[in-house]
Amino acid sequence: MPLEMSRGRETILLVEDEPDIRDFVGEVLQDQGYTVLEARDGEDALRVVEQYREPLHLVLTDVAMPKLGGRDLVARLLAQHPHLNVLYMSGYTDDALGARSVLEAGATLLAKPFTPRQLVSTVRQVLDAPASDELLRVP
């Protein structure tokens, strides 16, 4: 069922360790016209980015993953791509937004579960907002 929203042309790096969620998110975004590069964890994402030669516009990553989590992945990616837009997703919203936050101030978090419409709308909002390199300064 196609969503009636503005179609995307950007490239998104999707990093999610749960195959069913990765497949769902990838399909929704591809149906909206985005180019989607998929990775199963942070280490896999770094390999994908190293091999991809075109511009990358957004990293959409799970927060908690084995090997290399979302925040550490984002820090590494922003070191080489400081204008990359970032969108986190997590089923652990209370933990991720707690007093001793796992995420940096101002980070956009999409809480699981989400609908296709919520996904597409949030992705578009993050892509349309100016990217920030503030994440590089987070200890």
Predicted regions and their residues:
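Alpha4 helix (beta4-alpha4-beta5 surface) of REC/receiver domains from two-component response regulators
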Residues: 72, 76-79, 83-111, 117-124
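Conserved acidic carboxylate
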Residues: 16
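Charged docking surfaces used in two-component/phosphorelay signaling
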Residues: 23-31
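Acidic, metal-coordinating helix/loop segments flanking the phosphotransfer/catalytic sites
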Residues: 13, 26, 38-58
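Disordered, acidic interdomain junction associated with two-component signaling
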Residues: 1-11, 100
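Receiver (REC) domain active-site loop signature in two-component systems and cognate sites
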Residues: 65
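Acidic catalytic/metal-coordinating carboxylates
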Residues: 41-44, 68-73
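Active-site residues of response regulator receiver
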Residues: 62
